[in-house]
Amino acid sequence: MLRTEEMILNVGPQHPSTHGVFRLILKIDGEIIQEATPVIGYLHRGTEKIAEGLQYTQIIPYTDRMDYLSAMTNNYVLCHAVETMMGIEVPERAEYLRVLAMELGRIASHLVWWGTYLLDLGATSPFLYAFREREMIINLLNELSGARLTFNYMRIGGVKWDAPDGWIDKVKQFVPYMREKLAGYHDLVTGNEIFRERVTGVGRYTKEEAISYSLSGVNLRSTGVKWDLRKDEPYSVYDRFDFDVPVREGGDCLARYECRMAEIEQSLRIIEQACEQFPADGPIMGKLPRIIKAPPGETFVRIEAPRGEIGCYIASDGKKEPYRLKFRRPSFYNLQILPKLLKGENLANVIAILGSIDIVLGEVDG
């Protein structure tokens, strides 16, 4: 008589395809997943609690270390929240530098995802190509901020440094170069029949499920929901740029892949326009009080990060330190749908599905 037994399989917390200290407990029957339980918290550092004992400007370096693949957007959301509370006006030149930094960071983040995702699926070459192009972006951001990963570049009221001489020209030159490479990526991978067969119909969820799980960013837009805060609730100077919001209808790994690749092209469009509109001169810091104290009250702001909506809630009692600081981290919310996606799937699809969601554990754990 044929008999099967359920097996418990641990993926991680030290596993190359979890891209961080993440553990996934799988209950499997043969090759079919019966239940998936994510275990998080290995990288928890208590950022929000630490922030309660710091002045607002001292918190900025901690934001670099949440989503360390898109540190610029983390810098921005905190500064934007404090500026909103205090009514600080940011100079135009500083806003353009912020947008350029964030969009370059968005492309760099998507390149890391693209290279590692294909590596997880068994393709080595795309990983090398992605990091070749990412290195060019990191060098540009290094020239701008003095750092390669944890930039600590943005300041409440502006930015730390002005663009060095010739930096805007280098960014302009990067745009056509990246477009050419992006076309090569599509030839190599996107149109590859083996790749498309591997990810089509895998890890599918509906628009209604995406909304009920509070998914955002690409993970939401891949189900046909056209929602991007840069368009729908413009901040900084995003309302001055002409760009599209890529959406797909499939809600599967392929749809998420195509959305991210299309987003790289839109970021290039924004960068191109920002370089053309870049103010010839002007200050990079607004007028600030000598000591930054947010007035008593609370505020919540949200922006579009590479992994979705990142939000910052501040409750102030009028002191130099926040009474309470809370970040809405998109990776944390996006990860919640993983058990639903994995149930009933083949074991071989675990890494394909996890990689398509694109989480960063520093952001998940906080």
UniProtKB/Swiss-Prot annotation:
It comes from the Bacteria. One of its GO terms (molecular function) is NADH:ubiquinone reductase (non-electrogenic) activity. GO terms for cellular component: plasma membrane. The keyword Lyase does not apply. Keywords: Cell membrane, Membrane, NAD, Quinone, Translocase, Transport. Pfam families: Complex1_49kDa. Gene3D superfamilies: Cytochrome-c3 Hydrogenase, chain B. InterPro entries: NADH_Q_OxRdtase_suD, NDH1_su_D/H, NiFe-Hase_large. It is an enzyme of class 7 (translocase). Coiled coil: none annotated. It is a peripheral membrane protein. Its EC number is 7.1.1.-. It is found in: Cell membrane. It catalyses: a quinone + NADH + 5 H(+)(in) = a quinol + NAD(+) + 4 H(+)(out). PANTHER family: NADH DEHYDROGENASE [UBIQUINONE] IRON-SULFUR PROTEIN 2, MITOCHONDRIAL, NADH-UBIQUINONE OXIDOREDUCTASE 49 KDA SUBUNIT. HAMAP family: NDH1_NuoD (MF_01358). Belongs to the complex I 49 kDa subunit family. NDH-1 shuttles electrons from NADH, via FMN and iron-sulfur (Fe-S) centers, to quinones in the respiratory chain. The immediate electron acceptor for the enzyme in this species is believed to be a menaquinone. Couples the redox reaction to proton translocation (for every two electrons transferred, four hydrogen ions are translocated across the cytoplasmic membrane), and thus conserves the redox energy in a proton gradient. NDH-1 is composed of 14 different subunits. Subunits NuoB, C, D, E, F, and G constitute the peripheral sector of the complex. NCBIfam families: PRK06075.1, PRK12322.1. This is NADH-quinone oxidoreductase subunit D.
